Amino acid sequence: MERKLGTDRVKRGMAQMQKGGVIMDVVNSEQAKIAEQAGAVAVMALERVPSDIRAAGGVARMANPSLVEEIIQSVSIPVMAKARIGHIVEARVLESLGVDYIDESEVLTPADEVFHLNKSDYTVPFVCGCRDLGEAARRIGEGAAMLRTKGEPGTGNIVEAVRHIREVQAQVNKVVHMSKDELMTEAKNLGAPYEILLQIKENGRLPVVNFAAGGVATPADAALMMELGADGVFVGSGIFKSHHPEKFARAIVQATTYFDDYERIAEVSKDLGEAMTGIDVHSLAADQRMQERGW
């Protein structure tokens, strides 16, 4: 049967609609409803949040289709779900379930250590993680409609997300000020498609939205990432590992929307209880660093 493929323009346009918003990880329909009521622009359906995936170890896979369907039916906002890097069938199954976006995610155990998915071959838009412009451009070249920093998921530590957003921004600025003659050499240095770098130079920015993810644990963290130029925020473990998830979720949304209103951020941050326990990323062994997955 011939598949109908969404165009890059349509997929990127769908992702643009989430700009300025918060996307929350949820593991059941109750959490999905809390996220929607708090003002999330979308939810990410998965069986365990990144901190629990990290603690459990073993192989992390796509969520059970029954759970994904339950969450889709429980909310009116878009629903995303994660597939393992390079796992063609997980992605096809999620597409068949009717998810609005697929996250080809390093949070799950990669299925393929050589190839990422050919995301242009799907109707549903994809979101992918990146640490630098080389990774960002390769994922866009494969058809990703939305990017996010990798950060270091499940740590509650924002330092890696900050590093990644700053690195991408600096490299984008460098490309914008290059001559076209220099772009091919830069494409070689970055391992990036020349056509994507040309789009960046001509538009003055990435051709897709780039959200912050990986370590957002407080309203101030969310506001910081927006201040640094992120187009929106993914929050994984931070909300439902906090003492007051409903209040915490609303505070994250407010801080993301009004990221430069520091009095408002101070107000919404009051009486939230203790944030999730964090992990010093420098204490992680190399095989525990999820951001290293993919290329």
UniProtKB/Swiss-Prot annotation:
One of its GO terms (molecular function) is pyridoxal 5'-phosphate synthase (glutamine hydrolysing) activity. InterPro entries: Aldolase_TIM, PdxS/SNZ, PdxS/SNZ_N, RibuloseP-bd_barrel. Pathway: Cofactor biosynthesis; pyridoxal 5'-phosphate biosynthesis. Keywords: Lyase, Pyridoxal phosphate, Schiff base. D-glyceraldehyde 3-phosphate binds at R166. It catalyses: aldehydo-D-ribose 5-phosphate + D-glyceraldehyde 3-phosphate + L-glutamine = pyridoxal 5'-phosphate + L-glutamate + phosphate + 3 H2O + H(+). Gene3D superfamilies: Aldolase class I. Pfam families: SOR_SNZ (PF01680). D-ribose 5-phosphate binds at D25, G154, G215, G236, S237. Catalyzes the formation of pyridoxal 5'-phosphate from ribose 5-phosphate (RBP), glyceraldehyde 3-phosphate (G3P) and ammonia. The ammonia is provided by the PdxT subunit. Can also use ribulose 5-phosphate and dihydroxyacetone phosphate as substrates, resulting from enzyme-catalyzed isomerization of RBP and G3P, respectively. Belongs to the PdxS/SNZ family. In the presence of PdxT, forms a dodecamer of heterodimers. This is Pyridoxal 5'-phosphate synthase subunit PdxS. It comes from Oceanobacillus iheyensis (strain DSM 14371 / CIP 107618 / JCM 11309 / KCTC 3954 / HTE831).
